[in-house]
Amino acid sequence: MTEVLGRVHSVETMGTVDGPGIRFIVFMQGCLLRCQFCHNPDTWKIGTGTERSAQDVFDEAIKYKEFWDASGGGVTVSGGEPLLQVDFLIEFFTLCKAAGVHTTIDSCGGCFTRDPEFIEKLDRLMEVTDLILLDIKQINPEKHLKLTTKSNAPIIDFAHYLRDKEQPIWIRHVLIPTKTDDPEDLTKLHEFIQTLPNVKQVDVLPYHTMGVYKWKEMGIRYPLEGIEAPEEEVVALANKILETSSYK
């Protein structure tokens, strides 16, 4: 059988914000979206990154198992968009589950499709996936298109797929002043989340500018220049509307 290679951008050995506990995070290369607030624009380009086998990445990750066991952690595959490399994920997570490791995917679902071949692979992947971190950038279709250059229809459909699979998910929403903090949009997002009984946690992530330097290094104009982190009261209102405390 031909070994599946994944295109990996980088890894983080002791992540604490991408799933429960301490986690080994694999950032995959390639993404279809072009989010104006992306803090990893260097992961966008498809076909670049370092080619690595699932076994190779697993062998590096498993060295940190004692930290996962002590904290309830595991491995998270992020990006970029990890679902663009579903074959690699299946192989990598199969190795992880055989070793008793908790597995998480951080995805917006922007590449989701009902294509039978993709669904067949995704079904197999869900069998070895414990948790999905689903990033919903903007529930309003027009605003989502302007913010990311892509429709949010595949993302909404991916959420429906995960609901039907009864796959545990955490919803994550980046709160950006003037872009994603409109109370009306947040209310609609809350109403959508209420249709998903498989949601186990909802997180409001305040916008930050820590990735702006990457845009400058790549020679790309940063489109949100001048926008600062949201005020505490704005974050509090978002948490109230989304009822995040009810999931704790």
Curated annotation (Swiss-Prot):
Domain of life per record: Bacteria
Keyword rRNA processing recorded: no
UniProt GO MF annotations: 4 iron, 4 sulfur cluster binding; [formate-C-acetyltransferase]-activating enzyme activity; metal ion binding
Cell location: Cytoplasm
CDD domains noted in UniProt: Radical_SAM
Enzyme's top EC category: oxidoreductase
SUPFAM superfamilies to which the protein is assigned, alphabetical: Radical SAM enzymes
Cofactor(s), by name: [4Fe-4S] cluster
Enzyme Commission (EC) number: 1.97.1.4
Keywords: 4Fe-4S, Cytoplasm, Iron, Iron-sulfur, Metal-binding, Oxidoreductase, S-adenosyl-L-methionine
Pfam families linked: Fer4_12, Radical_SAM
Residues in Radical SAM core domain copies: 17-248
Catalytic activity: glycyl-[formate C-acetyltransferase] + reduced [flavodoxin] + S-adenosyl-L-methionine = glycin-2-yl radical-[formate C-acetyltransferase] + semiquinone [flavodoxin] + 5'-deoxyadenosine + L-methionine + H(+)
Coiled-coil ranges per UniProt: none
Binding-site positions, [4Fe-4S] cluster: C31, C35, C38
Described function: Activation of pyruvate formate-lyase under anaerobic conditions by generation of an organic free radical, using S-adenosylmethionine and reduced flavodoxin as cosubstrates to produce 5'-deoxy-adenosine.
Similarity comment: family membership: Belongs to the organic radical-activating enzymes family.
Name recorded for this polypeptide: Pyruvate formate-lyase-activating enzyme
Organism: Listeria monocytogenes serovar 1/2a (strain ATCC BAA-679 / EGD-e)
